[in-house]
Amino acid sequence: MEKNVKSSVTGISSQVSTHQLETKTQFTKYHTRGGHGFAAEDANAMYDRLQGKKVDMCGRDNALNGADRIVDGVKIQTKYCQSAQCSFSKAFDTTGQYRYSGMKLEVPSDQYAEVVTKMKEAINQGRVPGVTDPNQATQIVTKGKYTYAQAKQIAKPGNIESLKFDLTTQAAACAFACGISAGITFFIELQKGATYGDALKEAAKVGGKTGGLALLGSVASQQFLRTTIGRNCAAAATKAVKPAVQAAMKTEVGKNVITKTASVMAGKQVFGSAATNVVTKALRTNAVVSSVMFVATTVPDVVNVCRGKMTAGEAVENAACNASGIGGGCSGASAGAAVGTMLCPGIGTVVGGIVGGIAGGIGGSTAMKKLISLFK
């Protein structure tokens, strides 16, 4: 039962991880020429959230001269360039006027002092509309939490800065997996007649293992998607799932489910092709994340086979059950979330996803075990 719980919760965790990737990062742009700028936006936004601030990543609409994000009602434009002069000049239009009136200009922490000096000069020159006091430069320019070099590293795979960023953004998936698996295990142990103390010990053990596995898989997924191979896999997944989403949009029920699900994910009302794109991207990312999660659950068994602690047959059986559990968990979570969204967007989405994921994951893993037993 422990393995069933772990595989099903891992499947649900991949959904949580996908949600974090799609809503909290712009990972698909990290590999571009200005990818470090998007990484800087994401990293600084993450820091704001950790401080308990409300963050709206409004800049994804690419509005001309619009804010990249709004933090507790304050509009912020992020400029992370190679030099302070470049970061500063990017905030001014071709006529030499400050482009982002009423917004704070966020720059790399190591360029802050120099940009403030340049902003004071611009104010004295009358190039900042509505501002005449050069001392207000410190109120316009805000110090980013990361240096230019750190932002460059966050956009790339396989380094300390990007790993730290991924660990932080995916902590939610880990905590979710740990809590859900511990709760299920505790209930199962009590049903089996265990004492509260023993049930808590087993719940803590299973929860810790599952949470750690979820974190490993989530971080590995985020790192993998930064690589060329990862991006190619994501592109292939997009081609595979998009026709299905488009076909579903042609039915009334499918259109309703996709529109509501996309709106919950986007945090605002989206319709038509916009809703199709949101759901397609989520399914694409989830396909990659689930695959990485499967590898993460399989590697320990491969190691045990090499050490002689497990037979190859047992490893294959576990792999098949893990695949079924993760797949069932993902499918169940998706279906449950869709139904929950139709009934009550938001709360219904979460509850439906959890219930559907657990049922689908345990059901898939159990069914695979029974199928394998027929050939023994």
Model-found features: residue ranges?
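Short, surface-exposed, charge-dense and proline/glycine-enriched linear segments
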Residues: 84-98, 346, 360, 364-372
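Helix-termini ("caps") and immediately adjacent flexible loops/tails
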Residues: 294-310, 315-325, 357-376
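Glycine-rich, hydrophobic membrane-spanning regions of integral membrane proteins that mediate transport
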Residues: 1-34, 43-61, 69-75, 81-291, ...
